[in-house]
Amino acid sequence: MSEIALEELPGVGPATAEKLKEAGFNTIEAVAVASPSELATTAEIGESTAAKIINAARQAADIGGFETGDLVLERRKLVGKLTTGCTEFDEMMGGGIETQAITELYGEFGSGKTQVAHQLAVNVQMDREHGGLGGSVIIIDTENTFRPERITQMVNGLSEKYGMELNPEEFLQNIHVARAYNSNHQILLVDSAVDLANELKEMGKPVRLLIVDSLMAHFRAEYVGRGTLADRQQKLNKHMHGLLRFGDLFNACVVVTNQVMAKPDAFFGDPTRPIGGHIVGHTATFRLYLRKSKGEKRIIRLVDSPSLPEGEAVVAVTTAGLTDQ
């Protein structure tokens, strides 16, 4: 992350810098990845001025140009891996859940999506030695499924697993939850999450995990019928790219849970499909399909990844949290 102040950019004086900060653009990286219309609207400046500021920020932050594959490889060394707490699951994911990427968990009710999200919210706060990223968590809760009691159980489970004393209250203090009441509010909360992440970063508690549980609940309820599909997908596309940008800006994992639908015309194979269409499919970096099995067992299938082969892992959802079966 660049240490260059906003005021050092050509065309940005103290007054403009203040407007940008008020609009949530606290770093030159945040400015560099914005669109001119977005910057002009939120910071109340002209669109041509916004375009010049963005170009200057891209040059200063070294964003937007071509680079060779070896440099991309070098930069990817900054990508962190968050443990799931299960050996088989971690191996399937190439070491864990990646930062700077969106991981989608989809499956029918009771398949364990929220349980995985809760477990990751605990694991991310552990140090790197124990597979964590030593960071805070932001949760956008659309279905009122966050349960602090479950976090307490999982922290106690980790205490037993590693033979160390962990305080559940400290873990809960590092989890920041917001309830989203409609799709507009949900999108707005991503902007609020950027502001909160900047504040926490200054306090030495960087946000390393953003969870949206669930991604499509409000969109599915508000946009009914084929006539509203185009509007829904356009809005959803903006939301998904906002989440992706959050992951890039803060080197954080972004995990979204998703609902499913049955495809009645599927005569062979599993008729279960995630909702959200191609927008979610193309924007999510990793897609995981969760299925119920006997008792506590859950089967997690890696359906899509840019670098990993398809695979399956069997885990158990116990009182102590997510464990190897």
UniProtKB/Swiss-Prot annotation:
SUPFAM superfamilies documented for this protein: P-loop containing nucleoside triphosphate hydrolases, Rad51 N-terminal domain-like
The answer to whether the entry has keyword DNA-binding is yes
GO MF annotations, alphabetized: ATP binding; ATP hydrolysis activity; ATP-dependent DNA damage sensor activity; damaged DNA binding
Alphabetical keyword list: ATP-binding, DNA damage, DNA recombination, DNA-binding, Nucleotide-binding
GO biological process, alphabetically ordered: DNA recombination; DNA repair
Transport as a keyword of this entry, yes or no, is no
Looking up InterPro entries in the UniProt record yields:
AAA+_ATPase, DNA_recomb/repair_Rad51_C, DNA_recomb/repair_RadA, DNA_recomb/repair_RecA-like, DNA_repair_Rad51/TF_NusA_a-hlx, Hlx-hairpin-Hlx_DNA-bd_motif, P-loop_NTPase, RecA_ATP-bd
Amino-acid positions noted as binding ATP in the UniProt annotation, renumbered to this chain: G107, E108, F109, G110, S111, G112, K113, T114
NCBIfam families registered for this protein in UniProt: PRK04301.1, recomb_radA
Its family remark reads: Belongs to the eukaryotic RecA-like protein family.
User: What job does this protein perform?
Assistant: Involved in DNA repair and in homologous recombination. Binds and assemble on single-stranded DNA to form a nucleoprotein filament. Hydrolyzes ATP in a ssDNA-dependent manner and promotes DNA strand exchange between homologous DNA molecules.
**What protein does this entry describe?**
DNA repair and recombination protein RadA
Q: What gene does this protein come from?
A: radA
